[in-house]
UniProtKB/Swiss-Prot annotation:
Alphabetically ordered keywords of this record: Cell membrane, Membrane, Transmembrane, Transmembrane helix, Transport
Protein name listed in UniProt: Uncharacterized transporter MJ0718
The keyword Membrane is annotated on this UniProt entry: yes
Membrane topology: Multi-pass membrane protein
Example GO molecular function: chromate transmembrane transporter activity
GO cellular component: plasma membrane
Organism: Methanocaldococcus jannaschii (strain ATCC 43067 / DSM 2661 / JAL-1 / JCM 10045 / NBRC 100440) (Methanococcus jannaschii)
Broad class of where this protein is predominantly found: membrane
Pfam families given in the database record: Chromate_transp (PF02417)
Subcellular localization: Cell membrane
Record field: transmembrane: 26-46, 67-87, 96-116, 126-146, 168-188, 213-233, 235-255, 289-309, 312-332, 338-358, 360-380, 381-401
Residue runs in coiled coils: none
Length: 402
């Protein structure tokens, strides 16, 4: 039985309509996903399920390219994947819609939790709960360190660089210095591989237009910070601080923790380390990446406006970097020099996370009960149990036995 040509056309039109959603459709879909996608990096699986299996907006290969790109640039991986999907579907508007929609639920929930925190943190009944939260943060940092180690530590040289990075951070050297030292070591180790060919980056002509939008965004960032500088020095500090953190947050959201700790606690004394740990812990009760801690920091330092400024600032640089990287991704993923330097950076991140874990552990009042909560939460995280479940179970244990 032959199908009428008109029927074929209608069927094709329906497929194109289904596979090319509007920016509003993208926004609403990622908004819904952002409400339930707990688990940090594991949330990428939820994004894949929605866009590849359920809605069939992308094929597997295209989605995997987005995941691969998110792994080699700074920023929270799941946020970068969301933006990549949006860009694939609707260009710059789609990228912005997916990126903003995915972050919005986490921001609102974190803001709500922070307001509650400010009202109850001094109550006697909440002391044990926040002590349990800090133990969870130690478990989280230890688990993140273990995962980073398994992925990136390959040689004795890697272990040596890890130890140097950890020692420098423990000695209160800036993590930015640690990263630059790692890049320098990487250049020294792989300088023989540097050739004209290895430094060549090909940009397809049809993809050059994206840099026009990147230029607009960079100009917008400049104006944004200029206005903040003129009206409120504290808000300007929050903005530049969070942007700096985001630029160096390789390896996903966990990579931001040492930098944010250094900037917020050590360098500018905006809060003490225990309060910062509380912010990280509250972030685990929300969907979205660990960098949503920026909302907590922003609210404590600058109120509601501060929370908005911090949240926008901690996501903006990585969004711009993603857009800038899409045209050159094919060159980057096969570039030996880039891959080796990135490896050095990620190895140094393991060292930074080791130092952060030690520092956080020293802030906990350890007891047999605290050790039980740590072991239980660490094992559950190691076994990839849902983050929200782990946090809630640990809070119940803390309330009962601490």
């Amino acid at each position: 039985m032959m199908m009428h040509p008109m029927n074929k056309t209608n069927k094709r039109d329906k497929m194109e309509k289904r596979n090319n959603p509007s920016a509003l459709n993208i926004f609403m879909s990622f908004l819904k996903l952002g409400m339930v996608a707990f688990g940090g990096p594991t949330a990428i699986a939820y994004v894949r399920e929605m866009v590849v299996d359920e809605k069939k907006w992308m094929d597997e290969k295209s989605f995997n390219n987005g995941v691969a790109l998110a792994q080699i640039i700074p920023g929270a991986s799941v946020m970068q994947v969301a933006a990549y999907v949006g860009f694939y579907l609707r260009g710059i508007v789609g990228a912005f819609a997916a990126f903003m929609a995915y972050a919005l639920p986490a921001f609102l929930i974190m803001l709500f939790l922070t307001i509650i925190y400010m009202h109850v943190k001094s109550l006697p009944k909440t002391v044990s709960i926040f002590e349990a939260l800090r133990i969870i943060v130690v478990s989280l940092a230890a688990n993140g360190t273990l995962n980073f180690s398994k992925k990136n530590i390959r040689t004795i040289g890697d272990v040596f660089l890890l130890l140097i990075s950890a020692l420098l951070f423990i000695l209160k050297f800036s993590p930015f210095i640690v990263i630059f030292v790692s890049i320098f070591i990487g250049f020294l180790m792989y300088r023989r591989d540097i050739t004209k060919l290895s430094l060549k980056i090909d940009i397809p002509r049809e993809k050059l237009r994206i840099y026009k939008y990147v230029a607009y965004l960079l100009f917008g960032v400049f104006l944004f910070n200029l206005i903040l500088y003129m009206i409120d020095s504290k808000l300007f500090l929050l903005s530049t601080l969070m942007m700096k953190v985001d630029v160096f947050a390789f390896g996903g959201g966990y990579g931001s923790v040492p930098f944010m700790l250094h900037e917020v606690v050590d360098k500018y004394n905006l809060m003490d380390a225990k309060t910062f740990m509380d912010g990280i812990a509250l972030g685990q009760i929300t969907p979205g990446p660990i960098v949503i801690t920026a909302t907590f920091v922003g609210y404590i330092v600058g109120g509601f406006i501060g929370s908005i400024i911090s949240t926008i600032s901690v996501f903006t640089p990585s969004f711009i970097i993603l857009l800038s990287s899409i045209p050159i991704f094919d060159s980057l993923k096969h570039n030996t020099i880039f891959k080796n330097i990135l490896h050095m950076i990620l190895v140094s991140f393991v060292g930074l996370l080791v130092a952060v874990t030690i520092r956080f552990a020293l802030l906990v009042d350890w007891s047999i009960q605290a050790l039980i909560i740590f072991i239980v939460s660490f094992l559950l995280l190691y076994k990839k149990y849902n983050m929200l479940l782990v946090v809630l179970l640990s809070l119940v244990l803390g309330y009962l036995i601490l």
